[in-house]
């Protein structure tokens, strides 16, 4: 429950199919239950790393198949209905703009700004150093700002 929706959206960022993302999430949890790995980092970092690996394995297997449908991601928070609609639309536009970034930058931005992970946690998930995460975020934000401005979004980052 705690990680379900977030991990489903994270996996969906890779495979672009919400139904398959939910199936992969179940596989990730089944893996964790059956293998009971010795987790040396934080559990959250480990589970995101496992989700990423399962998504990449899925994509390697799916290269022979054509994915016909793509689900849209919506990020909603509890607020008034009108605010939820505005926030969801804004977040969708941000996510759509992120699709134009290199995958490492997109993943770093997603983990730090959308999932709220620390640089260290994101570094563990992406198998990079915290300094590399910082650089990916800087480059990603630099490339993303002009795209967001064309969408009418002035400030997407809290810095």
Regions found by a protein language model. Give the residues of each.
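Sigma70-family region 2
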Residues: 26-42, 61-63
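A short pre-motif secondary-structure segment
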Residues: 108-112
